[in-house]
Design a protein with these regions (language model features):
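Functionally critical, cavity-lining and gating residues within the transmembrane helices
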Residues: 43-44, 78-82, 122, 160-161, ...
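Short alpha-helical transmembrane segments in multi-pass integral membrane proteins
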Residues: 1-30, 88-155, 186, 197-253
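Transmembrane alpha-helix boundary and packing residues in multipass membrane permease domains
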Residues: 33, 37, 49, 86, ...
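Helix-terminus/linker motif at the lipid-water interface of multi-pass membrane proteins
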Residues: 38, 42-61, 130-137, 193-200, ...
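Alpha-helical transmembrane segments of multi-pass membrane transporters/permeases
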Residues: 111, 166-189, 207-210
């Protein structure tokens, strides 16, 4: 253990939560975090808005009905990323460089494995889940297309969220927000290009979202590759450290399960709406997508 961590945390984007009055620092930390959460939720909302305005009600139903399914499948891993943030923050407070390195090494590999697990799960489970939910036949194929393309980007989504967890553990909630703003602009512009310019419909908004997620992942990885030690990413050091993984899961899994429970209720509601047909799904998607 050494105290070199505190000497390396003077960057302007980082908030030192260990010294000085807390109220202002909590606000400076929490407001960008809340804005980041809102921007991530808006990704699907932008997809819904574009297809609803430029494609039609069936496409709107196909995209909008997927929001609770996406939440259900990824919330557990979002909780694990919260656990990662908590344990790295704890090591920073203890000024334990070695444990920070071990935790970040573990986080890197967990992000990679969870991303590819979700990618495969999305390809295999998309049609069975949407069929089980009673998605109408005239919507089902487009809904499956959207969900499968969306889940091709899961490695990027996991890379961003776990990378953001590392930055947030350092007291930096601003740079993840800046990255999400850039990705949001990319997503919106590509949505319009692919839907209006290329006529790609539902597939177009899914591809646009995937590219935007790739942009956010690339940017956050570049930031972390340039961080000072012990926070720098090293691809050749990816390794699961059992103690760090256990701590991460102990904190993160309950948070993830809590998010999944909320998503399950949304899936049940969506299944009920599906029984009324495509027009009902489109109407509810336009109204309820912001709630998800």
């Amino acid at each position: 253990m050494d105290n070199s961590v505190t000497k390396k945390r003077a960057q302007s984007n980082e908030i030192d939560m260990l010294n000085g009055p807390l109220f202002k620092k909590i606000l400076l930390f929490a407001l960008p975090l809340a804005a980041s959460s809102l921007l991530q939720e808006l990704f699907n909302s932008v997809d819904v808005a574009v297809v609803g305005h430029f494609v039609g009600s069936r496409a709107l139903a196909a995209v909008g009905s997927n929001a609770p399914v996406i939440g259900l499948l990824i919330n557990l891993f979002m909780g694990v990323s919260m656990g990662a943030c908590a344990i790295i923050s704890n090591h920073i407070g203890q000024q334990d460089d070695r444990s920070i390195r071990n935790a970040i090494s573990t986080v890197q590999l967990v992000a990679l494995l969870s991303g590819f697990f979700l990618l495969v799960l999305g390809q295999v489970a998309a049609r069975p889940i949407l069929t089980w939910m009673g998605t109408p036949p005239d919507v089902l194929d487009e809904a499956v297309t959207y969900l499968r393309i969306y889940f091709l980007g899961m490695p990027f989504i996991m890379a961003f969220n776990f990378g953001a967890a590392i930055l947030r553990s350092m007291g930096d909630t601003r740079r993840p927000l800046y990255i999400l703003v850039i990705a949001g602009v990319v997503n919106t512009l590509l949505n319009l290009l692919f839907v209006i310019g290329f006529g790609m419909g539902v597939a177009g908004v899914a591809v646009a979202t995937g590219i935007a997620n790739a942009v956010s992942a690339t940017l956050i990885i570049r930031l972390l590759r340039k961080e000072k030690e012990p926070f720098r990413l090293h691809f050749d050091r990816m390794k699961i450290h059992g103690v760090e993984l256990s701590r991460m899961l102990r904190i993160g899994v309950p948070a993830g399960v809590q998010g999944m429970i909320f998503s399950i209720s949304n899936v049940v509601v969506q299944s009920s709406i599906n029984s009324y047909g495509a027009d009902a799904i489109a109407g509810s998607s336009a109204a309820l997508n912001f709630e998800y």
